């Protein structure tokens, strides 16, 4: 995982709005929803690298740094940190932009984790990543 940075590391792969239906019992955005968004965003980059279907096989070091509020813009940034024969490891950071609550315009990193994806064939069996 990356060290602390003041700017997102990687490419913007997903941007969405945190909605009331995604809250936990405390009124903050549910961590599982954030993890789902990260998996979707990471899979977008992994599919581009693999030139096809991938499956998530591992999530490492999930760290929730700050809460996310309803109305916040949630941005997933992803970067490839390792390629294997069939797998790719993607570091994913979630950055939030406050647009519905104070302080308006503030940006901060809310969470980060390392996701590992494996390229698979139509039968779901691992296949080699393309050689670049």
From Swiss-Prot:
Q: Does the keyword Hydrolase apply?
A: yes
- Return the NCBIfam families for the record: PRK10694.1
Family in the record: Belongs to the acyl coenzyme A hydrolase family.
Keyword Metal-binding on entry: no
E.C. no: 3.1.2.-
InterPro entries in UniProt: Cytosol_ACT, HOTDOG_ACOT, HotDog_dom_sf, Thioestr_dom
Instruction: Show where the HotDog ACOT-type domain sits.
Output: 8-123
Keyword line: Hydrolase
Q: Where is the signal peptide?
A: none
PANTHER family registered for this protein in UniProt: ACYL COENZYME A THIOESTER HYDROLASE (PTHR11049), ACYL-COA THIOESTER HYDROLASE YCIA (PTHR11049:SF5)
What is this protein's name? Acyl-CoA thioester hydrolase YciA
GO biological process terms held by the UniProt record: acyl-CoA metabolic process; butyryl-CoA catabolic process to butyrate; fatty acid catabolic process
Q: Which GO terms describe its cellular component?
A: cytoplasm; cytosol
Gene Ontology terms for molecular function: long-chain fatty acyl-CoA hydrolase activity
Task performed by this protein:
Catalyzes the hydrolysis of the thioester bond in palmitoyl-CoA and malonyl-CoA.
Q: Which SUPFAM superfamilies match?
A: Thioesterase/thiol ester dehydrase-isomerase (SSF54637)
Extract the Pfam families matched here.
4HBT
- UniProt cross-references to PROSITE patterns, sorted A to Z: HOTDOG_ACOT
- What's the top EC group for this one? hydrolase
Q: Which organism is it from?
A: Escherichia coli (strain K12)
